[in-house]
Curated annotation (Swiss-Prot):
Functional summary from the UniProt entry: May act as a regulator of cell proliferation and elongation in the root.
UniProt keyword terms in alphabetical order: Nucleus, Repeat
The protein's name: Protein Brevis radix-like 1
Secretion signal span: none
GO cellular component terms, A-Z: nucleus
Main location: nucleus
Amino acid sequence: MFTCINCTKMADRGEEDEEDEARGSTTPNTKEAVKSLTTQIKDMASKFSGSHKQSKPTPGSSSSNLRKFPDFDTASESVPYPYPGGSTSSTPAWDLPRSSYHQSGRPDSRFTSMYGGERESISAQSCDVVLEDDEPKEWMAQVEPGVHITFVSLPSGGNDLKRIRFSREVFDKWQAQRWWGENYDRIVELYNVQRFNRQALQTPGRSEDQSQRDSTYTRIDSARESRDWTQRDNNFRPPGGSVPHHFYGPPMDAARITTSSRDEPPSMSNASEMQGEWVEEDEPGVYITIRQLPDGTRELRRVRFSRERFGEVHAKTWWEQNRDRIQTQYL
């Protein structure tokens, strides 16, 4: 009999479908594979990011560690370099507070270096100590009421006499010249004067303006050129307080003394407002500045250590060991 054409076509399609299924069972689907691979990569990435978050430091931990030692951190942040005067030949000056010494029950030792104002300070209990370079330092002494002398401390020891001022309320021109003539030798010996500052010696004549309060009286010739000059002991220490009002030494020629009135208005440089201050060498490399107050008491103004003999730690140790002795001996 004849075969149906439609049936033949359907049979052919069935065979083709069977062949496709056979191929599909042996070859993986490309989309399925890509999707599976993408899922695996995402899983790995999520695991990696999770472990990274666990090892990440907590916020603020680093900043808290930086401030674990606040004293050290503060000191390190406040140290400008290098030391005063641009010289490293000496250790930093100890400025002492303007008050009488009081014992403190707790030690408070703190080193702070300041260079460029240039100063290194140490504070021990109730006083601050500064280590300074061995450069010349000016200081003023009230020899007696109305007489103030400005000195410059010399690195090699002794003092340079820079200026003498007399109060107009106590001295006129001739009284001042007479006083200087009578007291010159005593001043040289008392304050261990090694030389005079010649720049301050020649001054103009006296002005008649009464608003000018003080005069400067200086010697014209250097003391080293004087026949009467003798080298003084570098270890001589001027005593504290006022010295006797009259001292009759060899008179000086009035022509060797000149006077001048200062042009500036009255200020703290006026003799009636000044306070006596002097420097004593306690031991080699240790210089102590003492001030005489108007009520007769003394205060410790400054302790200086030479860098050639003292480092910071050595200076601090020395001050802690000798503080009580210094207060008792000089105040």
